[in-house]
């Protein structure tokens, strides 16, 4: 028998370990090389581990919940070129009733195997064997059983006293919590605010949006304008494109901008590499790609590593103003917010303008107030007159 090991994928140096989330195959089940057999989760992404060959799952060495390292053995497969389906022995039953026998020598999990999925789910949620033992399985009569299971008379006293649902934090949520606490404890974080008139950007999008979409195949949003404004501002204020490493200040020559992306598992920050060399279309396409990958849990670890500055947009959720938290080891983060029409005094006259509050949180250990305020004002000025990028002022 040729046994092939199932290995944890290569993890980058910044990722210490991962946790086994879910096995999709059981020992003895046939597997093809295309199958995703187990999911593992790092503090950044969910990784799918595919079978290295065709065969039968022979052994699971790391169960769900286990902490594993890079290239650690998760289990092994007995390689087989000609796989024959292994028929699982059927449980003893009649066509009409499921046999109830206290001496029936199989596990509770196996006993409920022949119930329809909807019924198995309810039984597992109830976690009450007495409920199961009171039921006869009537073929194709799921509604009767569901009604029986949901009857309050079947609920024990302990169930009635439970008013909470306790679940284990995901690795991503744990890491987010750790990093937020790390930022609070290890940085001198301060936030400065400003506001920007978004009418010039709105007018640009309205004027060239249709042409842009026809040429590049993607709609132009607000984020590329902010990325470009940040890139130009970082060139003028190198101390913001830097970080503290013990007693040293590290200045970065490349401009890698992290973009906060909301996913079902939490917020992640994939990186726009060398954003200063990207066109508006490149930025928009990459952000769209990150969003899709985030929803589908397909973001790669290398896409999350190495950003030097972060942009986050709470405005898409309706936030009018906030104080974004620095993404360590970075030294600053820009917060975008909701665009809202407000009366503004312009040259002695009141005008209704689409305004957005901007927030820059920064590490005061490295960045002084003068630099932080000037940096944010530079972003504001570029957004209100995008021609500044063309003539570099």
From Swiss-Prot:
It holds the Pfam family Biotin_lipoyl. Its cofactor is (R)-lipoate. Transmembrane segments: none annotated. Residues 3-78 form the Lipoyl-binding domain. Binds 1 lipoyl cofactor covalently. It catalyses: N(6)-[(R)-dihydrolipoyl]-L-lysyl-[protein] + succinyl-CoA = N(6)-[(R)-S(8)-succinyldihydrolipoyl]-L-lysyl-[protein] + CoA. The modification N6-lipoyllysine is found at residue 44. The active site is at residues 364, 368. GO terms for molecular function: dihydrolipoyllysine-residue succinyltransferase activity. GO terms for biological process: L-lysine catabolic process to acetyl-CoA via saccharopine; tricarboxylic acid cycle. InterPro entries: 2-oxoacid_dehydrogenase (IPR050537), 2-oxoacid_DH_actylTfrase (IPR001078), Biotin_lipoyl (IPR000089), CAT-like_dom_sf (IPR023213), Single_hybrid_motif (IPR011053), SucB (IPR006255). One of its GO terms (cellular component) is oxoglutarate dehydrogenase complex. Pathway: Amino-acid degradation; L-lysine degradation via saccharopine pathway; glutaryl-CoA from L-lysine: step 6/6. PANTHER family: DIHYDROLIPOYLLYSINE-RESIDUE SUCCINYLTRANSFERASE COMPONENT OF 2-OXOGLUTARATE DEHYDROGENASE COMPLEX, MITOCHONDRIAL, DIHYDROLIPOYLLYSINE-RESIDUE SUCCINYLTRANSFERASE COMPONENT OF 2-OXOGLUTARATE DEHYDROGENASE COMPLEX, MITOCHONDRIAL-RELATED. NCBIfam families: PRK05704.1, sucB. E2 component of the 2-oxoglutarate dehydrogenase (OGDH) complex which catalyzes the second step in the conversion of 2-oxoglutarate to succinyl-CoA and CO(2). This is Dihydrolipoyllysine-residue succinyltransferase component of 2-oxoglutarate dehydrogenase complex. The lineage of its organism: Bacteria, Pseudomonadati, Pseudomonadota, Gammaproteobacteria, Enterobacterales.
